[in-house]
A protein has these predicted regions:
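Bacterial N-terminal signal peptides that target proteins for export
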Residues: 1-16
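Bacterial N-terminal signal peptides
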Residues: 12-26
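Formylglycine-dependent sulfatase
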Residues: 28-432, 436-466, 470-477
Length: 477
């Protein structure tokens, strides 16, 4: 019998190995839904039509809410940006993973992120928009901490499981994101400039997965600039028939808000600040509509789970800023309802029944356990996870949460259950107790009327805080 040359045997074995790897990836990915997490920046609970706003036009988000499940009590894990974002990808409270407030800490390599976990299940992963979980460059002065001043906080998306990214460290203007008009130092808004010669660099860059600064196609509406990168990522995955996990974290309507002429004209009867605030939200809404239309055109809408929320409540004082938390008390940076209760939707035509609303409290930390449950992956068991799977809720089989949600931010504390909320302002000695079902505006303190309930909830909160402190000390790894 004639034997094959060694090189032929080696090549044959190599191709067999490739076939095995490809087959394994296909097997892991078979039947698994695509997943997209959409988040706005500083969008208030009352800033959308589906929560009753009569001024700001959000027809695409309203249609998404009508086509899916709307959360009346969806919470950001923190009243500011970075901590909430980290909760989305870890399922953990910010104090556990070391980003307790905005522009503090970074995503540690020891943390398990959704992108890392989903890659093991055959997903391609992409991040588009605001990152805010670490610096994106070690060499160039960028944004709040980028460059030599923030080397210890270098933790870009590609170091946390993302195959592709088009990301900023932090905020940018919502129109011409890399530019600021010369001579204009406003922190709130300005009119769009038509000529780049009239502008100077804003100071925050977009970076890709190769660590390169990206400047092409960055003029005009920032939400469109972001979606221009997210859609090709989705198209490529759909062509390969590979499940995708995409994060689309818009900058709008974080200050400075700048809308283009078409969108400010929609709100011509309002003050300039409001025109830009409302306009950039409508521009963002159009990009959500564009994404939903693209999923339908690609034939993958029924196989794609779309989550939508905001990272915290609206910026500024209620009597001087255009954003609104509607009837809720408090705003950004507060653990009162208006600071952490945010718009929330999930749409999945293939599984989630349309036109449903839930009053069950849910939180951004629920994303990770929910997604792992949806794809039938093993839950994380080697460290505390604060979120819970919402799959029973998506399927219409959950009557109540039964697992309170804990909050801590700069001295403020809150413990929120299905009905009651325990709250303590930073520096205060006593807790307040609110019945959120009867009193969502938190006007009536029940702590003195129901001391036993307040004590029981306070004990639960302290036990949870003790667990978070163990995690913060690095003992989970």
């Amino acid at each position: 019998m004639t034997s094959l040359p060694p090189i032929v045997v080696g090549v044959s074995r190599f191709f067999c190995f490739l076939l095995f790897v490809v087959g394994l990836a296909d097997g892991l990915a078979a039947g698994k839904p695509n997943i997209v997490l959409i988040m706005c920046d500083d969008l208030g609970w009352g800033d959308v039509g589906f929560n009753g706003n009569k001024i700001i036009r959000t027809p695409h988000l309203d249609a998404m809410a009508k086509a899916g499940l709307k959360f009346n009590r969806f919470y950001a894990a923190a009243p500011v940006c970075s901590p909430t974002r980290g909760s989305c990808v870890t399922g953990r409270h910010p104090y556990r993973y070391g980003i307790p407030f905005a522009n503090s800490g970074h995503m540690k390599p020891e943390e398990l992120t959704l992108a890392e976990l989903l890659k093991k299940q055959g997903y391609t992963t992409g991040h588009f928009g605001k990152w805010h979980l670490g610096t994106l460059t070690k060499t160039v002065k960028d944004s709040n901490r980028g460059g030599l001043r923030g080397v210890k906080h270098f933790s870009p998306p590609q170091a946390n499981g993302f195959d592709f990214c088009f990301s900023t460290e932090s905020k940018v203007p919502t129109w011409d994101p890399l530019l600021r008009p010369k001579g204009n130092n406003s922190k709130k808004w300005w009119d769009a400039v038509s000529n780049a010669g009239e502008a100077k660099p804003y100071g925050t860059a977009y970076w890709n997965e190769r660590g390169e600064s990206v400047t092409e196609n960055t003029r005009g509406d920032d939400s469109r600039v972001i979606m221009d990168r997210a859609i090709p990522f989705i198209r490529g995955a759909a062509r390969r028939e590979q499940p995708f996990f995409g994060i689309v974290w818009f900058h709008a309507p974080h200050l400075p808000v700048v809308a283009g002429p078409r969108h400010t004209a929609m709100y011509a009867g309002h003050p300039n600040y409001a025109q830009h605030y409302y306009g950039c939200i409508t521009a963002l809404d159009e990009q959500v509509g564009r994404l939903r239309a693209e999923l339908r055109a690609l034939g993958v809408a029924d196989d794609t789970v779309l989550f939508f929320c905001s990272d915290n409540g609206p910026e500024g004082q209620a009597d001087s800023a255009p954003g609104t938390a509607a009837h809720l008390s408090g705003r950004k940076r507060s653990l009162l309802e208006g600071g952490i209760r945010v718009p929330g939707i999930v749409e999945w035509p293939g599984r989630v029944k349309a036109d449903r609303t839930t009053d069950i409290p849910c939180v951004t930390s629920d994303y990770l356990p929910t997604i792992l449950d949806l794809i039938e992956a093993k839950p994380i068991s080697d460290r505390p996870i604060d979120g819970m799977s919402l799959v029973p809720l998506l399927d219409g089989k959950l009557a109540k949460r039964d697992r309170p949600i804990g909050f801590e931010s700069k001295g403020q504390l809150a413990w929120i259950g299905d009905r009651y909320k325990l709250y303590r302002k930073g520096g205060a000695a006593e807790f307040k107790l609110f019945d959120l079902v009867a009193d969502p505006s938190e006007k009536n303190d029940l702590a003195k009327a129901q001391p036993r309930l307040a004590k029981r909830l306070a004990d639960q909160l302290e036990a949870w805080r003790a667990s978070c402190q163990v995690s913060a000390a690095g003992k989970d790894y």
